[in-house]
Amino acid sequence: MDEQLICRAVEQAVREAGMAVMTLEKAKRLIDKVEKKAEEMGVRAIIAVANTAARPVAVHCMDNAYIASFDIALNKAYTSAGLKMSTAKLSELAGPGQPLYGIQHTNEGKIVIFGGGEVLEINGKIAGALGVSGGTLEQDTFLAAYGKEVFEQGV
């Protein structure tokens, strides 16, 4: 049986089960849009897209992006997919005296508690997450929110 035929059959079964699927094709289209916006802003970013299991589907490194941003972008996508919330929202819940204080020390330190990670949905169902790193906190947060909006409009 043809591999593409199998992939289409699996995607159809998942859709019928009421689940959303993050495909490599969707991830690449999203990354392209976020990269263009980052270029407009003068940001050299690393952009990561994860599936609902918080596993990377695609990672893109813009030229001259910070080396450390690679793991940070992956971990932002991991955090948003794994906790089903943006990393900006998590930052509110993870401060001193808040219910999730200290969560960044779990999961082998992969939980990120600052902006740049967003949950991605298709028709109200979670398909995965986006992580962006390389700019300021505000730039990463903006680019991730932009990516979420673009994705949900049908990348």
Predicted feature locations:
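Flexible, solvent-exposed loop/hinge segments and secondary-structure transition points
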Residues: D2-V155
